[in-house]
Amino acid sequence: MSSIRKKSSGRYEARYRDPSGRSRGKTFATKKAAQDFLDRTGVDIGDRAWRDPALAKVLLSEYTTWWLENRPELRPRTHELYEGLLRLHIEPYLGECRFELLTTAAVRTWHAGLLRAGKPGPVTVAKAYRLLRTILNDAVEDGLLARNPCSIRGAGIEHSPERPVATIVEVYRLADAIEKRYRLMVLLATFCGLRLGELLALRRDRVNLVNGRIEVTEQRQELSGGTRYYGPPKTAAGVRSVALPPHLVAEVEQHLSAWVPPELDAFLFTGPKTASLRRATFDTAWNRARSAVGLDHLHFHDLRHTGNTLAASTGASTKELMARMGHASARAALIYQHASEDRDAVIAAKLSALTEEALKGSVEP
């Protein structure tokens, strides 16, 4: 129910009840302006598009701060990523914008400005856009927006360049060049597809040489300040059992004997002075090794990409590759399919055959 009342000042007060039943009012210079406002408000309420005028004055930075503080489900590394994206790439440009002014045009101007500046790179811009879109989806649910203004087609898609693939000979050159205590990390990343975080969390009791399998159940992440924490792998698919290629069995046995304490929960990979390998320590060793063999362009994660490519060349199916590498993509299509451990062992054996063939007659530079 709405009404218009002429005030002693000569202005007209339009009054109405919001969807919660609360009485609200707004004054206008003319009766027609007041009636037009009530007509528009009535339509908005009927279409469920009405928004509390007080919420429209909220600054984006106020909401993003509250939003991040109320996401206890985020992993520490993800929380750190989001905090950095907000602090560096979103709030300096849009933080002082009130929700009533947060339009598609404003978002488009912000997005175009980041791309035009060239820093950060397009991948980071896509991450920032996706985060803003996620936050504003929640703002719609919380009643601050009628619709999400993040509607730029393709803006959240990361167009990363194709990563390089190392040859088997190059992998072994890297393994030979790196410090001996890290040699097995290079080989497991390549031939078992383990991520760096999964390698850093790997313990003695997760390696079964009798069955020739490695059980991946956790990963270790390290924040920018050096804080380390352990948790489940990146996705549910990351929890997996990976067949060990036969040609790596002797490598694993030698590593366990030389570098790993006898306790079942002992980490497979440690630093020279600590029981837990710091990321910076390994990065230094990795950078030295790749420079020594002329592969400065190769990142450690490229070894996992290399292993995926090699496994695919053995004839492994998509679902078998997903199971071996711990990929979560396309899971909906594969929900009723199960990768066979026997088939994974076949893939591992073929990887060994590929390795033996590639190393046969190879000459060190």
Can you say where each PLM-predicted feature lies in the sequence?
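Catalytic-site neighborhood detector that most strongly recognizes the C-terminal catalytic loop/helix
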Residues: 157, 207, 220, 318, ...
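Short, surface-exposed polybasic/aromatic micro-patch for ligand or macromolecular engagement
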Residues: 2-55, 235
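Short, basic (Lys/Arg/His-rich) helix/loop patches that form interaction surfaces
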Residues: 117-118, 122, 173-183, 192, ...
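Short, charged, surface-exposed hinge/linker loops at domain edges
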Residues: 49-70
